[in-house]
Amino acid sequence: MATKEQLYNPAIESMLRFFHAVTPLSPEAMAAMSCCLYQEKYPRRHLLHQQHRVAAHLYIVSKGLLRSYHHHQGKEVTIALGMENSVLCAMDSLLSHQPSYYSIETVEESEVISIAYNDLELLYNEFHEVERLGRLMISRYYLEQEAALRSLRFQTAEERYQDLLMNNPALLQRTPLGYLASYLGITPATLSRIRAKWGGSDRYHSGI
């Protein structure tokens, strides 16, 4: 049972307005969703989900920055980065109910809204508009992942950096150099050279 504080949490109310802007939601659907959304504040590098465990939640960034990553041969490979209003989750595990290939953690101090996938499925069954919202949000998530994969396969490192510089400059400034290099599929040294060429600076979060 949600508490009064949860029902009237400003961050959750703001997130519900964002959802309503994505697709119209009835007052009944918004009230039901508010009972299933939980907000927490986390410090930098707080682990939300660990690789090899079965995922149970979706995470929506209210404030801050999250990343999804995979441990491979002793290294962390950053798969996705998410700022405000982004959704991060171990979708492979949520859909298959098998252990996940990915971990999710905060990159900076963050406010995160979570919803249990089981609760979301119950909302899908009860409210058609919530099912549509979920479909739209998951489609957006997959399109972002597909764009990132396509970029890695068909663009040079410099072209990938240029895309971020044009479309998401805040992500460049807020993401530590090592995470950003991993996300772009290059070494930190290569990223430093590219940033220097394009007038960037590594004074922003130069360390992990």
Task: For the regions a language model picked out, list residue spans one by one.
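Glycine- and acidic-residue-biased ligand/ion/polar-headgroup-sensing regions
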Residues: 45, 56-67, 84-85
